[in-house]
Curated annotation (Swiss-Prot):
Family affiliation: Belongs to the universal ribosomal protein uL1 family.
Keyword Transferase: no
Organism: Gloeobacter violaceus (strain ATCC 29082 / PCC 7421)
Subunit and interaction comment: Part of the 50S ribosomal subunit.
Annotated protein name in UniProt: Large ribosomal subunit protein uL1
Length: 238
């Protein structure tokens, strides 16, 4: 049986696991229970009523966090010819063609996101076993297979994230840092909810939203009232 540390026990006592919290209260608790010695990431863990083994029930899309992620993201780009130089000028941390593919095959993985142009995807397919398990394989649905490298790099650097449901139908999306203001966290959280709603697959049956939890990296899980979050209208929202 796993023994909880005194610290985690004390944090868990601040959260009633039987209570589904209003969004504002949940964020208040998130900040209260984040007391590690580093700026913890604010995380969402969302269980959906889908069965990802069926193609028409898979969830994979992107979300733009309007207040950013709070993290510097390292972007690698695979392209050909002038597109490599275009990516470098646009702010890619590393860009290349066949030589970069060979480096990755040799173990180079110092990047958080991979973007590729469509014409090099047949070669990128060789990296499937390396990139796939890490969630780094470029995909059109995720906005990471594109000829618009400048736009894609700018968006992902600014706070765009790719997400997908895992094999159990759970989506895990970071939505900032606990040092963010409550207003910034709420803006990002609302964007996550909107993105999940837009990504609802055609084959989803019954109740789409099952549970919606947030937590800090080292903190306890806090369940949010998803209906209250969906009904929430933020200032400046259309």
């Amino acid at each position: 049986m796993v023994q909880l540390s005194k610290r985690l026990k004390a944090l868990r006592e601040q959260v009633d696991r039987q209570t589904i919290y209003a969004p504002q209260k949940a964020l208040e608790l998130l900040k209260q229970t984040a007391n590690a010695k580093f700026d913890e990431t604010a995380e969402t863990h969302i269980r959906l009523g889908i069965n990802p083994k069926y193609a028409d029930q898979q969830v994979r899309s992107t979300v733009v966090l309007p207040r950013g992620t709070g993290k510097a993201i390292r972007i690698a780009v695979l392209a050909k010819g002038e597109k490599v130089r275009e990516a470098e000028k646009a702010g890619a941390d590393i860009a290349g063609s066949e030589e970069l593919i060979e480096r990755i095959q040799g173990g180079f993985m110092e990047f958080d996101l991979m973007i590729a142009t469509p014409d090099i995807m047949p070669q990128v397919a060789r990296l499937g076993k390396l990139l796939g398990p890490r969630g780094l394989m470029p995909s059109p649905k995720g906005g990471t297979v594109t000829m618009d490298l400048v736009g894609a790099i700018r968006e992902f650097k600014a706070g765009k994230l790719e997400f997908r449901a895992d094999r159990t139908g759970i989506v895990h999306i970071p939505f900032g840092k606990v040092s963010f203001t409550p207003e910034a966290l709420m803006d990002n959280l609302k964007s996550v909810q909107d993105a999940i709603d837009r990504a609802k697959p055609s084959g989803a049956k019954g109740r789409y939203w099952r549970t919606f939890h947030i937590k800090s990296t080292m903190g306890p899980s806090i369940e949010i009232d998803i209906n209250a979050l969906r009904d929430l209208k933020l200032e400046g929202a259309a």
